[in-house]
């Protein structure tokens, strides 16, 4: 029979399908040849088996059909064993057969395998693998230190196959077992049904051996198993087959949880987190590798068992030390940022180096690039937190517990001393980057309910913030994980203990956590930004001056400027990532809605329309910490300074902010802290359209904000609120805190130009006199004789006075300009006796320095350098006088200003008006007013002479003037005139005689003395009228 016929017979045999190929059938026959000869006498022929014979295909081996048929069952088993051997070789790339490859068919077997020589010797004649010895074979393969040295060719092909060598000789056993798992999965989809159980068993063996490897890694020489696990996951993420790896890991984790006798599951997995920690801490924000590691952690936070280990792993050694949280794995991630790692040290900082050598466009491109990475980074952190919150009640409790403890341990970040002692600060608390990133992630968690009309928003329960004295178990039951909030000052004092619910929802916890995080992080960074900005301006001026004078300090100043500019750009970039800002604005607008609803007594889940007058129910505000409102204001002020385009693109939501400002600015019942209410004026100034700014394509327009303001339905109530807070400023703090009061009033001026309202303000420009003296000394050369140190001190003093003078002059320009504007329409408020005295005193004091004998003291080299505009001031003051001059009471009050008024003061003012070319009608009107006031002054002089001999009982003890409305002070029991004590209390809320606290409602009229004074006055008047 020819070879062709022989092959045809094989192919027609129904049992040929048991073999992988014709060559395999021949090989099988060769293996059986000797066995059949030995057994031919013992195995009788069976006619039933003849139909299934394969003898026709084996003529060349001299076998008959009957001989093959008699041993069918044996043959079938052998065929199956042969296929199992091949399958094991394909899955595990190992073999016991090192025979000549030319004798092997090459069909169905891998091209390269690791030859297990020791095991082959041990098994002697058996050169195939089966299910009884495969586990031993796998173990032997895993113990090989260099499997690449044991590779053999399984086929006669001479083609170089590097991938086959790499796969079979894989040295890293964890990666090897994963590859075996993948090959086993593939086999399961391909093998015949009779081999399927064996393929599944092989797959299970990869899992069980991986479990063994993880439980006893010490027995595998030079194998860092946990490093391999991390590297495998890293490679899978980068190669887009991560799901395959996680499928494998899921089964391994399940197997590990079933066998914790040798090592517990956390003990097995903690080394993995150690590796991630050591690798991540050295990565930068803009390194792609960072995001692959974050994806690994994202998987771990989705996998319930790994998530538990992760949460256990990130617990700090000392929970009361805020800085320790930064050293945990989650803390290390949160610390990654474009901010400086070591404050003030720009060396080795990867961002914005040598900014003066970069064009604005290059800086903008770098900023945009960082923002892209930041957005991705914040999304990863958010997903991690979200996974842990949603995975199970246990993981939710653990991550909230961690966050609550972390914020409590870092509460000291807000203390004043913390900013003044940075070296101690950074040993005690987590970094600014930590809180900025945490805040960004928490903001994302809040977005589902950060919509003005969200019903979920109003489920926030403020009593959460005043709970105290809870143990850990109670916190878990009630879902209260924040600590120490009960020590925070609330918007108003509580009059009664609130009713606490059984537990709190996640909206309440999220809002409280997020707001406090922003308070600890964003708020502090904003303060730093402002200071950096101021220092940059100061350095720039000093650098320019040094260059002009060819000072050797110029280079040093330039270096300082470069370093500070790097810090500024890094900080600004970190704080202005667009999505974070938008999320924060969404939160703050929602907070404005929430606080307004609480302020009008709404305790339901649906918002109530705002209407005036406001209802009385607002007790819930007693449980809302002040920093909720402070954050809102601080963020909007930040946007105005550093990211104004966000305000314009979100203008429609600003109406809710206006509602908040309208209600709280003028309502001491709803917001007790006058400093906080005064700050709301700055918030209003921040969100209002600034129509005087220079148009620029890079600066957003104000069209949308203008529309919101023009259509605001509660403009009258907003103006009234501003008036109230303006008055309250006079009752705030120490009477000598001029700078603070300047800051409070400054934002009100542009607001009052834009919306009707009113205010008055007093300030001093005496600093100009000090500048004048120092400039004279400098010009005369008197400074040249000073030592360098003394000269520097003088220069610094001059610069300081110049800054102060510029600051005060801006305030004076704004104050007087606003008053001249307002008094054209509003008069009654300004002619009130208490207020009129203060306004007149201020105006006369100005005139005395602007047109009187002291005017020379205010002449400096360059008025514009200090924003000093004397001509405009004189004109505005005269306008105020003319606006209010029709009021008899006001005119009569002018001469009573004994400090600055004199009969010649107004005459000198007329002379200056002519000199600065003011209109003739204005000059004539002011001259007439001056004559009228002089007449009233003469009349008052005559009256004072008439009453000059009044007894001391009738005289005010402070002013030594005759009292018209005597009142008794409750503490000191001293009698003073009502106008005197009222004026005193505007700036100092104490009894002037014993410094006891005092308010106007505590004083009592001295009716008896008043009647005595009136009788005496009547008698004196009668005596004067009688002819001598």
UniProtKB/Swiss-Prot annotation:
Molecular function terms, GO-annotated: ubiquitin protein ligase activity; ubiquitin-ubiquitin ligase activity
Post-translational modification N6-acetyllysine, affected residues: 386
Its EC number(s): 2.3.2.27
Keyword Cytoplasm: yes
Top-level taxon of origin: Eukaryota
Pathway the protein contributes to: Protein modification; protein ubiquitination
Renumbered residue ranges of the record's region Disordered: 33-57
Localisation per UniProt entry: Cytoplasm
Coiled coil segments of this chain: none
Domain U-box: 949-1023
Gene Ontology cellular component list: cytoplasm; ubiquitin ligase complex
Pfam families listed in its UniProt record: U-box (PF04564), Ufd2P_core (PF10408)
InterPro entries: Ub_conjug_fac_E4_core (IPR019474), UBE4 (IPR045132), Ubox_domain (IPR003613), Znf_RING/FYVE/PHD (IPR013083)
Catalyzed reactions: S-ubiquitinyl-[E2 ubiquitin-conjugating enzyme]-L-cysteine + [acceptor protein]-L-lysine = [E2 ubiquitin-conjugating enzyme]-L-cysteine + N(6)-ubiquitinyl-[acceptor protein]-L-lysine
Record-linked Gene3D superfamilies: Zinc/RING finger domain, C3HC4 (zinc finger) (3.30.40.10)
Keyword field contains Cytoplasm: yes
GO BP annotations listed: ERAD pathway; protein polyubiquitination; ubiquitin-dependent protein catabolic process
Keywords associated with the record: Acetylation, Cytoplasm, Transferase, Ubl conjugation pathway
Expression (tissue specificity): Expressed in liver, heart, brain, kidney and testis.
Family: Belongs to the ubiquitin conjugation factor E4 family.
Function (record text): Ubiquitin-protein ligase that probably functions as an E3 ligase in conjunction with specific E1 and E2 ligases. May also function as an E4 ligase mediating the assembly of polyubiquitin chains on substrates ubiquitinated by another E3 ubiquitin ligase. Mediates 'Lys-48'-linked polyubiquitination of substrates.
Domain remark text: The U-box domain is required for the ubiquitin protein ligase activity.
Protein name: Ubiquitin conjugation factor E4 A
Annotated source species: Mus musculus (Mouse)
Gene: Ube4a
């Amino acid at each position: 029979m020819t070879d062709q016929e022989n092959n045809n017979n094989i192919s027609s045999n129904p049992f040929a399908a048991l073999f992988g190929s014709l060559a395999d059938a021949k090989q099988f026959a060769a293996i059986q040849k000797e066995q059949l000869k030995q057994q031919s006498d013992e195995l009788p022929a069976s006619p039933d088996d003849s139909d299934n014979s394969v003898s026709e295909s084996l003529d060349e081996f001299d076998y008959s059909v009957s001989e093959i048929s008699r041993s069918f069952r044996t043959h079938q088993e052998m065929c199956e064993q042969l296929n199992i051997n091949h399958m094991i070789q394909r899955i595990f790339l190992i073999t016991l057969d090192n025979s000549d490859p030319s004798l092997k068919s090459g069909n169905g077997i891998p091209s390269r395998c690791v030859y297990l020589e020791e095991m082959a010797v041990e098994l002697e004649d058996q050169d195939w693998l089966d299910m009884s010895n495969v586990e031993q074979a796998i173990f032997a393969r895993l113990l090989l230190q260099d499997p690449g040295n044991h590779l053999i060719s399984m086929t006669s092909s001479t083609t170089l196959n590097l991938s086959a060598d790499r796969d079979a000789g894989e040295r890293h056993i964890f990666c090897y077992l994963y590859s075996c798992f993948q090959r086993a999965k593939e086999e399961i989809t391909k093998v015949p049904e009779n081999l399927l159980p064996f393929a599944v068993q092989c797959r299970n063996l990869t899992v069980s051996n991986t479990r063994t490897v993880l439980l006893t890694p010490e027995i595998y020489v030079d194998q860092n198993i946990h490093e391999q696990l991390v590297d495998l996951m890293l490679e899978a993420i980068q190669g887009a087959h991560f799901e395959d790896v996680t499928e494998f890991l899921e089964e391994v984790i399940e197997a590990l949880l079933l066998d914790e006798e040798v090592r517990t599951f956390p003990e097995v997995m903690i080394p993995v987190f150690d590796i991630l920690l050591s690798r991540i801490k050295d990565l930068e924000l803009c390194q792609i590798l960072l995001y692959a590691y974050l994806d690994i952690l994202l998987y771990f936070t989705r996998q319930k068992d790994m998530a538990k280990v992760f949460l256990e792993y990130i617990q700090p050694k000392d929970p009361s030390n805020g800085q320790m949280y930064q050293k945990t794995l989650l803390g290390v991630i949160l610390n990654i940022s474009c901010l400086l790692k070591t404050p003030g040290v720009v060396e080795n900082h990867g961002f914005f180096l040598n900014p003066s050598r970069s064009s604005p466009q290059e800086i903008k491109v770098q900023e945009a690039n960082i923002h892209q990475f930041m957005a991705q980074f914040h999304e990863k952190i958010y997903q991690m937190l979200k996974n842990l919150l949603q995975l199970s009640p246990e993981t939710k409790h653990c991550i909230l517990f961690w966050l609550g403890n972390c914020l409590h341990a870092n509460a000291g970040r807000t203390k004043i001393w913390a900013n003044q002692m940075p070296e101690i600060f950074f040993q005690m608390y987590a970094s600014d980057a930590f809180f900025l990133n945490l805040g960004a992630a928490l903001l994302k968690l809040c977005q589902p309910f950060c919509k003005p009309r969200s019903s979920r928003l109003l489920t926030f329960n403020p009593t959460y913030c005043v709970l105290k004295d809870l143990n850990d178990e109670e916190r878990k039951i009630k879902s209260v994980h924040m600590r120490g909030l009960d020590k925070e000052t609330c918007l108003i004092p509580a009059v009664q203990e609130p009713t606490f619910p059984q537990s709190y929802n996640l909206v309440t916890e999220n809002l409280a956590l997020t707001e406090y995080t922003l308070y600890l992080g964003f708020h502090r960074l904003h303060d730093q930004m402002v200071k950096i900005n101021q220092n940059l301006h100061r350095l720039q001026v000093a650098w320019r001056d040094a260059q002009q004078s060819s000072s050797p300090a110029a280079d040093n100043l330039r270096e300082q400027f470069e370093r500070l500019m790097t810090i500024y750009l890094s900080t600004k970039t970190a704080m202005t990532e667009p999505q974070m800002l938008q999320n924060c604005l969404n939160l703050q607008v929602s907070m404005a809605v929430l606080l307004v609803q609480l302020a009008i007594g709404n305790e339901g889940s649906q918002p109530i329309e705002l209407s005036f007058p406001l209802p009385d129910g607002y007790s819930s505000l007693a449980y809302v910490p002040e920093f909720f409102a402070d954050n809102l204001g601080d963020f909007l002020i930040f946007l105005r300074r550093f990211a104004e385009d966000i305000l314009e693109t979100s203008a429609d939501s600003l109406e809710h902010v206006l509602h908040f400002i309208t209600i709280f600015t003028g309502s001491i019942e709803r917001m007790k802290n006058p400093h906080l209410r005064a700050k709301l004026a700055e918030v209003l100034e921040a969100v209002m359209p600034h129509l005087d700014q220079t148009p620029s394509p890079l600066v957003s327009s104000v069209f949308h904000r203008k529309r919101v303001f023009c259509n605001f339905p509660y403009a009258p109530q907003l103006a009234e609120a501003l008036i109230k807070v303006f008055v309250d400023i006079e009752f705030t703090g120490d009477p000598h805190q001029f700078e603070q009061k300047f800051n409070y009033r400054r934002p009100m001026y542009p607001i009052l130009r834009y919306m009707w309202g009113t205010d008055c303000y007093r300030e001093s420009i005496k600093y100009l006199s000090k500048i004048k003296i120092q400039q004279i000394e400098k010009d005369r050369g008197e400074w040249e004789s000073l030592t360098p140190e003394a000269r520097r001190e003088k220069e610094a003093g001059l610069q300081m006075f110049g800054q102060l003078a510029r600051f005060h002059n801006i305030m004076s320009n704004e104050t007087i300009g606003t008053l001249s504007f307002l008094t054209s329409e509003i008069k009654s408020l300004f002619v009130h006796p208490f207020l009129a005295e203060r306004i007149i005193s201020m105006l006369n004091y100005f005139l005395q320095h602007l047109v009187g004998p002291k005017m020379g003291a205010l002449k400096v080299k360059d008025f514009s350098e200090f924003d000093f505009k004397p001509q405009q001031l004189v004109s505005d003051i005269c306008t105020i006088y003319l606006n209010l001059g029709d009021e008899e009471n006001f005119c009569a009050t002018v001469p009573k200003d004994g400090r600055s008024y004199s009969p010649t003061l107004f005459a000198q003012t007329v002379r200056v008006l002519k000199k600065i070319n003011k209109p003739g009608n204005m000059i004539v009107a002011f001259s007439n007013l001056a004559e009228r006031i002089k007449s009233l002054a003469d009349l008052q002089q005559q009256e004072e002479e008439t009453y000059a001999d009044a007894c001391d009982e009738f005289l005010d003890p402070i002013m030594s003037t005759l009292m018209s409305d005597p009142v008794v002070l409750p503490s000191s029991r001293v009698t003073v005139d009502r106008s005197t004590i009222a004026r005193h209390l505007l700036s100092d809320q104490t009894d002037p005689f014993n410094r006891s606290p005092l308010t106007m409602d505590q004083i009592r009229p001295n009716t008896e003395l008043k009647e005595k004074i009136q009788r005496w006055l009547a008698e004196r008047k009668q005596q004067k009228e009688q002819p001598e």
